[in-house]
């Protein structure tokens, strides 16, 4: 029996819509392929970092562009690996290229900190 990976495989437009909807949470989205050397070199680091976070805190997801390349088009992904850092349906940052586990962990921490910010006065009044 294999262990469940600490990330979700995104395989449909419905999955993407779930991530991108307002209230969709905090997400690290990795566009990758098995034929991409840097993607495969980063795979273990991605899994390791994903395992360090609670899914309620930040959700790690992967889109295999070989089998689901159509899901990359709306994000204008032209190179892989591409990682998107998303909160509440908004892309806050994008990184193209291999990331170390340390850098990925730091980016995920940054994303979590953005999601935990309390709204300012205007946000409380009009949000």
Label each residue range with its predicted role.
Residues 79-119:
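Non-catalytic, surface beta->alpha helical segment in thiol-disulfide oxidoreductase systems
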Residues 36-39, 83:
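The canonical Cys-X-X-Cys-His
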Residues 58-60:
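Hydrophobic/aromatic anchor residues within beta-strands of the central parallel beta-sheet
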Residues 11, 64-66:
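Conserved acidic residues
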Residues 27, 69, 75-87:
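Structural micro-motif
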Residues 24, 32-35, 79:
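Short pre-active-site segment immediately N-terminal to redox-active cysteine/selenocysteine motifs
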Residues 38-54:
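Typically the conserved alpha-helix immediately C-terminal to a functionally engaged Cys/Sec
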